């Protein structure tokens, strides 16, 4: 591909009010360095956990770090798709997105190192076939497909897989698990800070994915069917992953966690995304570019979680 023009030189410059550039500016303003997080007390708290509690927490962290690494490796075709569309603002944001995924991989590995976990951790994923299906097959396949087919429909399928299922259901449920483990027991302060920082980053990621689906649905209503179909394909797989994780621990899950609570939480986060995308049907595409409802949805989820956890800790 040869370059014929530069978007930043066009008349009027860049539209700083567009959602992608709002997200980009937000990421710059909230920059954080993993090296600033103190994991000293986490090691002491870790030693006080039971064997099953350490096993559960290690498995949870393993799922997170492998997922962060997977997206670090797989997101590049989405950048190329944005370039093919001439969407500089989205491409700028996705460079930040990729950097943040790499940083998340770094900080989870730093936490594992800090609590003394150095063995090979692949076995923690071997017992979770749904995880392997999502992260080792569905995610790379739909993102890599953008290299050959950057069409709106392919973008919607890729965004559903990552932004709505992996981040919008599974990662949010994982943060919920960490909060139930850490906040309610006042342990692992480094992990608490880590999750707070990563959660803030990934709210922007999810908002961008919702925005991308909304603009394609607004432009062509056929993409609503693409969105709906892909969500309905993957939601059962995401819920099966939660069930597989709990099945490993029998009738007494570590930390007194509840499978039904987690399934309800994850389902709620998945189902509420349908309405946000549906609301874009028939809308002028230009309106979607400066509609901040995707970011507001993620902030709503975060506020709900804060209130729930505050009530549980009271």
UniProtKB/Swiss-Prot annotation:
GO biological process: deoxyribonucleotide biosynthetic process
Function: Probable oxidase that might be involved in lipid metabolism.
Protein name listed in UniProt: R2-like ligand binding oxidase
Record Gene3D superfamilies: Ribonucleotide Reductase, subunit A
Keyword Oxidoreductase: yes
Quaternary structure annotation from Swiss-Prot or TrEMBL: Homodimer.
Cofactors that this protein relies on: Fe cation; Mn(2+)
Gene giving rise to this polypeptide: nrdB
Position of the 3-(O4'-tyrosyl)-valine (Val-Tyr) cross-link: 71-162
């Amino acid at each position: 591909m040869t370059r014929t023009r530069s978007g930043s030189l066009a008349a009027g410059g860049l539209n700083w009010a567009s959602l992608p550039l709002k997200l980009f500016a937000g990421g710059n303003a909230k920059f954080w360095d993993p090296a600033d997080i103190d994991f000293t007390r986490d090691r002491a708290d870790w030693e006080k956990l039971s064997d099953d509690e350490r096993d559960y927490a290690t498995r949870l962290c393993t799922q997170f770090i492998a997922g962060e690494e997977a997206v670090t490796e797989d997101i590049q075709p989405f950048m190329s798709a944005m370039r093919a569309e001439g969407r500089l603002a989205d491409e700028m944001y996705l460079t930040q997105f990729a950097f943040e995924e790499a940083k998340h991989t770094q900080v989870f590995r730093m936490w594992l190192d800090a609590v003394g976990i150095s063995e090979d951790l692949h076995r923690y994923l071997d017992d979770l076939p749904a995880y392997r299906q999502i992260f080792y097959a569905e995610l790379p396949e739909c993102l890599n497909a953008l290299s050959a087919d950057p069409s709106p429909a392919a973008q919607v399928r890729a965004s559903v897989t990552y932004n709505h299922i992996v981040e919008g259901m599974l990662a949010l449920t994982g943060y919920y698990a960490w909060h139930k483990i850490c906040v309610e027991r006042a342990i692992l302060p480094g992990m608490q800070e880590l999750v707070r920082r990563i959660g803030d980053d990934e709210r922007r990621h999810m908002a961008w994915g919702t925005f991308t689906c909304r603009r394609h649905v607004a432009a062509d209503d056929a993409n609503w069917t693409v969105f709906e179909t892909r969500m309905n394909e993957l939601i059962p797989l995401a819920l099966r992953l939660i069930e597989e994780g709990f099945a490993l621990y029998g009738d007494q899950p570590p930390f007194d966690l509840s499978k039904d609570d987690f399934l309800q939480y994850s389902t709620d986060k998945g189902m509420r995304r349908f309405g946000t995308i549906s609301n874009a049907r028939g809308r002028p595409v230009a309106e979607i570019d400066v509609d901040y409802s995707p970011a507001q949805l993620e902030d709503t989820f975060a506020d709900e979680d804060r209130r729930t956890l505050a009530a549980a800790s009271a």
